Amino acid sequence: MTELRSERKNGNWDRLFGPFFESWAVFKAPQAKSRHIIAYWTRDQLKALGFYMNSEQRRLPRIVAWQYFVSIQLATALASLFYGISESIGDIVNLGRDLVFIITIIFICFRLVFFAQYAGELDVIIDALEDIYHWSIKGPATKEVQETKRLHFLLFMALIITWFSFLILFMLIKISTPFWIESQTLPFHVSWPFQLHDPSKHPIAYIIIFVSQSTTMLYFLIWLGVVENMGVSLFFELTSALRVLCIELRNLQELCLGDEDMLYRELCRMTKFHQQIILLTDRCNHIFNGAFIMQMLINFLLVSLSLFEVLAAKKNPQVAVEYMIIMLMTLGHLSFWSKFGDMFSKESEQVALAVYEAYDPNVGSKSIHRQFCFFIQRAQKPLIMKASPFPPFNLENYMFILKQCYSILTILANTLE
């Protein structure tokens, strides 16, 4: 299996759409694999959007100016939403709508702060995973390893395309709401001094606010989507690395063919490989700890608030559908992380089984046997995606959250009745 030919593309549009073109090229060529890991491509997308705040980007005046500009736009949008709350007091449906988008913007702001603080450390992790991806595998495991890398890349890209399709569709619906809901003049309910948001009093200011709202939220939701894909893809690459390790272990005896020296070298290499995965996992959990905590709190708030608003707006189907979409997107976001966290933990548990299958008590010296025992013992502890003190991201805890949401829904339904 070969990598696609590398072409020098530095334009922002090439960077932004690069992973989609790459996935199509890999899909069309059965023997080809991606030139880079998903996290590498998503980092390029963030650079194309002009909001990846590592030391390299901070040295570019044009990029810094752009970051200040869009940050001011986001802060202005948040301030106008807060100012608009005063008009929604007494109307549960509109107040809930304002709070949903205020919470979303606060979440985006937190992600911006996170990247400003940890972009350099993320670069180190991405580069380490990129190096692992390009390691050459020799022996009987070669074909299966390359096919695994290709399949993982295509599956994740299919998920990214699906996620972005829903995200952009949602934004288009929100931007178009003033055209089919008479009571709404802007995509998001805001209030400005001197009634600048009123189209009958200030038509030019209204158009500027409308365009600013639409472009700012479209930009930052796309940015947020890329950021989430990057975060998940880091753990997905660790999952892929664990899968590659398992494949190599299951082909270890066939590769060495009784050569004890080769067996010892390969076993030590794989032990160090496993140790590197553990260290990268610990580093990722440390970096994302605050982001995970904020993410779980925001998801719980959005789901609970959306459930309440769906019940409160049951006499207004259009508003109820809008909140239902928000709730489904929030649950989709949480399930996105939970599923990949679950895959990561389960794949890490397979390593101990693969080491056990590779162990042959009739082959090797005592030092080799001790190495196998050490490897099996260490691999029995599963790796997890976790934010202390919260439980790990997996499907079991995801179902627990769904049960809590259902309990809240029941209480709210009884209260409103």
UniProtKB/Swiss-Prot annotation:
It is a multi-pass membrane protein. GO terms for biological process: detection of chemical stimulus involved in sensory perception of smell; signal transduction. Disulfide bonds: none annotated. Residues 1-62, 120-152, 228-290, 338-393 are cytoplasmic. It is found in: Cell membrane. GO terms for cellular component: dendrite membrane; plasma membrane. The chain crosses the membrane at residues 63-83, 99-119, 153-173, 207-227, 291-311, 317-337, 394-414. Keywords: Cell membrane, Membrane, Olfaction, Receptor, Sensory transduction, Transducer, Transmembrane, Transmembrane helix. Expressed in olfactory sensory neurons in the antenna. GO terms for molecular function: ionotropic olfactory receptor activity; odorant binding; olfactory receptor activity. Residues 84-98, 174-206, 312-316, 415-417 are extracellular. Odorant receptor which mediates acceptance or avoidance behavior, depending on its substrates. The odorant receptor repertoire encodes a large collection of odor stimuli that vary widely in identity, intensity, and duration. May form a complex with Orco to form odorant-sensing units, providing sensitive and prolonged odorant signaling and calcium permeability. Involved in olfactory communication for modulating aggression through the sensing of the male-specific pheromone 11-cis-vaccenyl acetate (cVA). Interacts with Orco. Complexes exist early in the endomembrane system in olfactory sensory neurons (OSNs), coupling these complexes to the conserved ciliary trafficking pathway. Belongs to the insect chemoreceptor superfamily. Heteromeric odorant receptor channel (TC 1.A.69) family. Or49a subfamily. The atypical heteromeric and topological design of the odorant receptors appears to be an insect-specific solution for odor recognition, making the OR/Orco complex an attractive target for the development of highly selective insect repellents to disrupt olfactory-mediated host-seeking behaviors of insect disease vectors. Odor-evoked OR currents are independent of known G-protein-coupled second messenger pathways. This is Odorant receptor 65a. The gene is Or65a.
